[in-house]
Regions:
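N-terminal hydrophobic or amphipathic segments with adjacent small-residue motifs
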Residues: 19, 27, 68, 76, ...
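Residues at secondary-structure transition points
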Residues: 8, 31, 98-102, 125-128
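Conserved SAM/SAH cofactor-binding pocket of Class I
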Residues: 105-145
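A general structural signal for well-ordered alpha-helical segments in protein cores
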Residues: 14, 33-34, 64, 77, ...
Length: 145
C-alpha cells in the first residue's frame, strides 16, 4: 500500500477513494472514483478496469487527489471532468453552465417522434445553459435553422 515503499495500484486507490467519498456522502462514490481516475490516466472506464493492477505514479496521484477532495466537498463530477455526454454528444461544462440532465434527452426524443426528418425547419432554444438541446437538435435536424 501507499507509504510502504510500493506504489498503490489502480484497484487500491479506487477502493480507498470509494470509501472516502462514501463517508463524505457523495452520490455514486464508486462511479465518481472511476471517472475521476480514468480522466487523470487518460483512459476510458474499460481501460481503467483492464488496468486494475497497474501501479500509479506520484504525478498521477498528485493529479487525482485534488479532484477527489473537490468531489468530497460536493462538486459535481461533470464540472471536475469538464464535460458531460448528452444524446451521444460530448459537451463542455463549467460552473458557469448548467449540466445536461438525462431527463432532458426526452425533449430531443419527443422532437424526433413529432417531426419526421426534414419536417422541422426552425427551432429556438431559450436560456440554453450548456446549449445541449440546440446543438443536438441541429445535429438531428441539419436542414433546420
Amino acid at each position: 500500500m501507499e507509504g510502504r515503499g510500493r506504489a498503490p495500484t489502480v484497484r487500491e486507490i479506487l477502493g480507498k477513494t470509494e470509501g472516502y467519498l462514501q463517508e463524505k456522502g457523495a452520490d455514486a462514490p464508486r462511479l465518481s472514483a472511476q471517472l475521476l481516475l480514468a480522466k487523470v490516466l487518460g483512459l476510458d472506464r474499460l481501460g481503467l478496469v483492464l488496468a486494475m493492477d497497474r501501479p500509479l505514479s506520484v504525478e498521477e496521484l498528485d493529479g487525482y487527489r485534488p479532484l477527489v477532495a473537490r468531489r468530497g466537498k460536493g462538486e459535481p463530477v461533470a464540472y471536475l471532468l469538464g464535460e458531460r455526454e448528452f444524446f451521444g454528444l460530448d459537451f463542455t461544462v463549467t460552473p458557469d453552465t448548467l449540466i445536461p440532465r438525462p431527463e432532458t434527452e426526452l425533449i430531443v426524443e419527443r422532437a424526433l417522434e413529432l417531426f419526421p426528418q426534414g419536417a422541422l425547419s426552425r427551432f429556438a432554444d431559450l436560456g440554453t445553459g450548456s446549449g445541449c438541446l440546440a446543438v443536438t437538435l441541429a445535429v438531428k435536424f441539419p436542414q433546420a435553422r
